Amino acid sequence: MGFKFEKLDVWKQSLDYSDAAYDIAELLPKKERYNLSDQLRRAATSVSLNIAEGSTGQTDKEQNRFLGISLRSLIEAVACIHLIRKRNYCDTEDEKKQLKSLYKEANHLAARIQAMRNSLAGSVDEPEIDYFAED
């Protein structure tokens, strides 16, 4: 693996999440192909793409910004999960189990992304300079 992001466990987990989201998207009715199904796929894919983009050649502050975008994309995917559940698009026991698993995985991934953001936040904090202080 030649890129920094390829070594990140959180990125690897986000790929698994995206894969599972694609599986759910395939279960949705044809009428949702270009709406909810597409939205779920794009949101889930955006999680790993932003982790990757932010990790390569960026400052900690910039990487933190991309992780924030990644986290918001994950939340968007979770909102899609709620819509899928509310519309009863996953109605068999196996499909319900897959949807519940995707939700749990989102919780775990969100915690990992936030932990990474917190670790970066500590490295970008700089002391405030008081330019008007007397020497």
Q: Can you annotate each of these PLM segments?
A:
Residues M1-E53, G57-D135:
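Short, C-terminally biased terminal segments at protein or domain edges
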